[in-house]
């Protein structure tokens, strides 16, 4: 550690660690039902249609919640807004454990809906936290660190749940209670630790100056989301979130595809998923580091972000060939490579918002974009299910073609909408250099 680094300090990374913890809990909680799906379906006599209704309930709530949770976080501030989000998902997460067999379907639909509302606040709050605590040149890397925790949560879920829950469903309630307790612990740590950098008593003057080194002065007036919708920059970011459906395809349909294509079962799905999500984590960290390093070398933010996203789009292309590959491990590698590219794409896409918008609009813009991404993911799930029912496994061919090619197409439209990434001031007017 250099003398300059010691002088500046690193308290901002304590805040980032809490965001990492929250996002890990978020994805672990989200993955529990998917991991236990075969056991729960047998235990509660659910049909596939019943299970689909539970999943769609979560996604609908998540999409709707993204719209207003972002606004709540912008209006109430990051500290209170993030707390409200995780308290909601803690309550509904633990509510799963109280559901009785006679009301299992409606109970899980309600619980997943509430969970979706609460969890929808995580990413808007996390991005806003990074915008408040990191200078622009470090935001992509910081976003990459916390975004990597999505894979951590997805990796931990099958191992922890498998160690607790028996094959016949004994102890199925315990994972929901564990996540509720972890979330409660997080709330205590968050309320004790978080303040805005400008008023935080443990932040050095040198670190505060570093955080604000490339930030503009802003007013405290909040920007209504209706004023954000006409901005091309809002829709440029929203387009990048359309790829969320691809990520959820890997997360929720990946195990099913590997089972039907390569005979992978619940006992040996762990290693393929471990490889895929570790690669995703590596992509998340590398993507954030790369664009940040390019900015530090003198590249414009516009060039650094878009070139990094272009590289991501290119390395994702080979996943289109997965349905025609005979080797399970080559298929796993290509899915992992695509997951890595997606995570790198995603964190650079997120940082477009604080790069362009004032801090007070960040959570709302993120919420608008993510809501659109979830809506597309819901439509994609319905369409894929229908195609698989009518055309069989050949439906995966088109799913992977879209998953592989969509990033390049979307990046082209992002550049058309936002060719120069000119920053906006508090009144959403362009800041002239």
Describe each region flagged by the PLM.
Residues 146-198:
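Helix-loop-helix hairpin linking two adjacent transmembrane segments in secondary transporters
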Residues 87-102, 310-326:
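C-terminal ends and interior cores of transmembrane alpha-helices
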Residues 284, 354-390:
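A late C-terminal transmembrane helix in Major Facilitator Superfamily
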Residues 140-162, 166, 280-284, 370-380:
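Glycine-rich segments within core transmembrane alpha-helices of 12-TM secondary carriers
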Residues 64-105:
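Conserved MFS/SLC helix-loop-helix module at the cytosolic interface between two early adjacent transmembrane helices
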């Amino acid at each position: 550690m250099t003398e300059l680094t010691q002088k500046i300090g690193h308290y901002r990374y304590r805040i980032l660690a809490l965001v990492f913890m929250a996002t890990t809990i978020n994805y672990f909680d989200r993955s529990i039902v998917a991991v236990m799906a075969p056991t729960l379906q047998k235990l509660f006599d659910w049909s596939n249609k019943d299970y689909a209704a539970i999943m769609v309930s979560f996604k609908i709530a998540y999409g709707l919640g993204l719209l207003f949770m972002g606004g709540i976080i912008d209006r109430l501030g990051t500290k209170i807004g993030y707390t409200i989000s995780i308290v909601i998902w803690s309550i509904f997460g633990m509510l799963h454990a109280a559901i009785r067999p006679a009301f299992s379907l409606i109970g899980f639909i309600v619980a997943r809906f509430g969970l979706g509302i609460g969890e929808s606040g995580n990413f808007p709050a996390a991005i806003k936290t990074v915008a408040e605590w990191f200078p622009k040149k470090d935001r992509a890397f910081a976003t990459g660190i916390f975004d990597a925790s999505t894979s951590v949560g997805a990796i931990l879920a099958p191992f922890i749940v498998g160690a607790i829950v028996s094959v016949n469903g004994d102890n199925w309630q315990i994972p929901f209670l564990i996540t509720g307790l972890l979330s409660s612990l997080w709330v205590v740590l968050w309320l004790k630790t978080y303040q805005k950098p400008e008023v935080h008593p443990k932040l050095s003057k040198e670190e505060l100056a570093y955080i604000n080194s490339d930030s503009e002065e802003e007013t405290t007036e909040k920007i209504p989301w209706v004023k954000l919708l006409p901005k091309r920059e809002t829709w440029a970011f929203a387009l990048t979130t359309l790829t969320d459906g691809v990520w959820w395809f890997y997360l929720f349909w990946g195990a099913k595809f590997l089972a039907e294509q390569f005979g992978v079962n619940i006992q040996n799905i762990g290693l393929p998923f471990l490889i895929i999500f570790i690669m995703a984590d590596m992509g998340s960290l590398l993507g954030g580091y790369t664009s940040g390093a390019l900015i530090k070398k003198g590249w414009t933010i516009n060039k650094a972000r878009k070139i990094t996203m272009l590289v991501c789009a290119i390395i994702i292309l080979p996943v289109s060939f997965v349905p025609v590959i005979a080797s399970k491990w080559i298929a796993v590698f290509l899915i992992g490579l695509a997951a890595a590219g997606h995570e790198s794409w995603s964190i650079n896409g997120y940082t477009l918002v604080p790069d362009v918008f004032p801090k007070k609009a960040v959570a709302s813009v993120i919420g608008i974009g993510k809501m659109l991404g979830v809506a597309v993911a819901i439509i994609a799930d319905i369409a894929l299910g229908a195609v698989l029912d009518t055309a069989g496994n050949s439906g995966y061919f088109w799913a992977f073609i879209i998953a592989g090619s969509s990033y390049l197409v979307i990046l082209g439209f992002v550049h058309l909408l936002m060719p120069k990434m000119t920053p906006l001031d508090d009144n959403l007017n362009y800041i002239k250099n």
